Regions:
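Hydrophobic structural patches
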Residues: 2, 30-33, 122
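N-terminal helix-turn-helix DNA-binding core of bacterial DNA-binding proteins
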Residues: 7-54, 65
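Conserved residues at beta->alpha junctions
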Residues: 3-4, 86
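Conserved alpha-helix in the HATPase_c
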Residues: 57
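Charged, amphipathic alpha-helical coiled-coil/dimerization segments
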Residues: 10, 38, 42, 60-123, ...
Length: 131
């Protein structure tokens, strides 16, 4: 039941991401970095549920485009701290707004009560709770 919805969501988001030349993982990284202060690659990977080696290519690409920056960690010479740049925040905001407009169109098919219930249950599921 969830798989068809997920496929439709991904199909709806892919053109938005492509229009802004960002991958799904790149967008996830920008979202995570915008929600918190600088973090290490390992902490970021844990926060988004990815292996730290899996996101290296995405981090390299985001850095090359000036969307994130990597700085040496003053407390650990082996680690680099990651932060979103103003340009990265601009891209993240544009993608997020377009995706949210698409979600609003989908949710517009639901009554107010259905929408409230759907969002509550979805929030519970994504938080790992039992509805």
């Amino acid at each position: 039941m969830v798989a068809p919805l997920l496929r439709e969501l991904i199909a709806a988001e892919e053109p938005v991401l492509a229009a802004h030349d960002v991958t799904m993982w790149g967008y996830v990284v920008l979202l995570a970095l915008d929600r918190s202060s600088m973090r290490t690659q390992a902490a970021l990977a844990a926060a988004i549920g990815a292996d730290k080696t899996r996101i290296i290519r995405d981090l390299d690409e985001l850095q090359q485009r000036g969307l994130i920056e990597r700085r040496p960690d003053p407390d650990d010479r082996r680690a680099r701290l990651l932060a979103i740049t103003d340009a990265g925040r601009t891209v993240k905001n544009a993608v997020q707004e377009e995706i949210q407009r698409g979600e609003e169109r989908w949710l517009g098919n639901l009554s107010t009560a259905e929408r409230r219930t759907f969002l509550r249950v979805l929030g519970s599921l994504t938080a790992g709770e039992t509805p």
